[in-house]
């Protein structure tokens, strides 16, 4: 992935990404999720036990190496397994939790627009609460993200994979249906049919998808309560976001069970998914903990950023210009006071030496709304100059320090 440096220009990916991260964090916090941070390096077996030994992530995409003790270490390819491992190790699997995370992940795949081998991911997990309201909260968060960033041509797909027994019965029926056509399947789908039949539904092959049109539907294997949940979510949220029940929807990781979902946008082209998640009630016990109901979702931030158009930050910016080195200590104290009076305003102090002209150029380059200028004469008279930079009709004015404080508080 490219280096990230925030230059404040929302047309550039780094600055855009930082702003997206900030807003996503605010949404998570608004829903009362608590932050969790997990290690970048994990025991590689963690992902074999959770994501699935037959998954593309484990077989083709995971970055792993042997450490000095000959233990196989992996760079985390996703966040959920690490979160559950942490909960199990701390013996917190008997409690309920609402957690969010954000950070770098690694997968060895072909780099393309919005997809890098190192990428940033944001996610949330609701742990210890049975199916029901957590599903509504997940879709509510997804809708909030779509609304906050005004994502266009967007659709949320939802499905239910049923209980473990429902899933097994459906997989058996799917294998029986596809067995006579196995010679028509490509190598990848043939392998999936025998290792993880559910993943055949996610095939990118047009021939396979054509065969699946007459295949059994999971709708015929799940109970009425699961179908009612899907219908209820669609009914309650369809006036906020476009929602579709898609009984062919599966997720790419083996630990999913029950309710699953993804958000897609035609703006991304053929690979249109940018967010996904679902319930994984059995993952905690698979990793050595107690049986713990759980649901989560995640989105790749670089890919998500391709859908987002941001205008330059609306936060007020003020440049603080000191004209003489001998007054810097006293002038800086005034700047410190200004920052304490209004934390919503960004106050940029030009720390390097230079002329008024060069410092004003910097202020304009930084898109500052105002420049506050202090020279020897101003400090001696306990005054400061306020110069508007975006409104040519307003003239600069000299004010007392007390009036400067009042002006800054009111910004």
Where are these regions (language model features)?
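Polyanion/phosphate-binding surface patch
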Residues: 40-73
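A generic structural motif
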Residues: 69-71, 125-132, 162-164
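Positively charged, Gly/Ser-enriched RNA/tRNA-binding surfaces
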Residues: 16-33, 42-43, 60, 78-92, ...
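A positional/architectural concept
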Residues: 35, 72-75
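Auxiliary tRNA-acceptor-end handling modules of aminoacyl-tRNA synthetases
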Residues: 1-17
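Short, conserved secondary-structure transition motifs
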Residues: 159-172
